[in-house]
């Protein structure tokens, strides 16, 4: 899949909205593009040839499902999200892990450096109703995680930093879901993952959690790991932490 180069739209009533988005992201406006950000009357979507329309979703219908999924996941055991805990999801992607963490009461800030993915996440957040906004603490900053961490003052360090780096092994598995296939092709491998982990360890209060393929050697030796069927969650403790 080539880099997203255009914004399309469902009908002429949405042309102005699509043009504004195209200008914002420095993309072309092309209603006939077969690979593009695609504006519909209901949501912003990602249109890819041979795939159905894809979109981020933080609506109420997904919360109970994701919370149920989360109870069975190493993600929750590793991050221990509870009310009042501040979690920084440094590599948001489609926002699914962030949404699961938020349903357990944590205050989750997503970072996403790819402008197309950030636009999809922003749209998903905007579609929430007021009740969802009050119930779930989930927000987004369109930023590179390394730059963001460098800008943080110590008093603003999160309790937990969660990192789910892109890595080449994801391309090799037939079990990879279509959303992850597209994300992998759109974003590519996170070659700065090691730098991000090391920087995170000096900008976090409690722990850094890294999601990594089960059979792949960790980038750094972890202090602990929680194994799943295909992935594991490597846990790193900053030296000054007492938790």
Swiss-Prot record:
Q: What protein name is recorded for this chain?
A: Ribosomal RNA small subunit methyltransferase J
The role this protein plays is: Specifically methylates the guanosine in position 1516 of 16S rRNA.
Chief localization: cytoplasm
Is Nucleus a UniProt keyword of this protein? no
Sequence similarity: Belongs to the methyltransferase superfamily. RsmJ family.
- Localization: Cytoplasm
Reactions catalysed, as given in the entry: guanosine(1516) in 16S rRNA + S-adenosyl-L-methionine = N(2)-methylguanosine(1516) in 16S rRNA + S-adenosyl-L-homocysteine + H(+)
Gene Ontology CC terms, in alphabetical order: cytoplasm
| Record key words, sorted | Cytoplasm, Methyltransferase, rRNA processing, S-adenosyl-L-methionine, Transferase
Residues binding S-adenosyl-L-methionine, per UniProt: 112-113, 164
Q: InterPro entries from the xrefs? A: 16SrRNA_methylTrfase_J, SAM-dependent_MTases_sf
Might you give the EC number(s) for this enzyme? 2.1.1.242
Say if the entry is tagged with keyword Acetylation: no
Any single GO molecular-function term of the entry would be:
rRNA (guanine-N2-)-methyltransferase activity
């Amino acid at each position: 899949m080539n880099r997203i180069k255009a914004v399309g739209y469902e009908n002429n009533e949405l042309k102005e909205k699509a043009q504004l988005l195209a200008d914002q992201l420095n993309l072309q406006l092309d209603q006939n593009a077969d690979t593009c950000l695609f504006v519909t009357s209901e949501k912003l979507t990602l249109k890819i040839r041979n795939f159905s329309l894809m979109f981020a979703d933080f609506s109420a219908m997904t919360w109970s499902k994701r919370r149920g999924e989360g109870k069975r996941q190493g993600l929750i055991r590793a991050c221990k999200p509870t009310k009042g805990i501040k979690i920084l999801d440094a590599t948001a992607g489609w926002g699914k892990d962030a949404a699961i963490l938020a349903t357990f009461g944590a205050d989750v800030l997503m970072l996403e450096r790819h402008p197309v993915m950030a636009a999809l996440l922003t749209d998903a957040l905007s579609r929430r109703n007021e009740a969802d906004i009050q119930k779930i603490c989930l927000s987004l900053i369109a930023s590179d995680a390394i730059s963001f961490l460098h800008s943080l003052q110590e008093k603003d360090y999160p309790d937990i930093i969660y990192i789910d780096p892109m890595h080449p092994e994801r391309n090799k598995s037939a079990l990879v879901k279509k959303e992850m296939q597209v994300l992998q092709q759109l974003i590519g491998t996170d070659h700065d993952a090691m730098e991000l982990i090391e920087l995170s360890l000096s900008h976090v209060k409690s722990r850094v959690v890294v999601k990594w393929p089960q059979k792949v050697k960790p980038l750094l030796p972890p202090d602990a790991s929680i194994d799943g069927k295909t992935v594991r969650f490597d846990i790193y403790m900053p030296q000054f932490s007492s938790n």
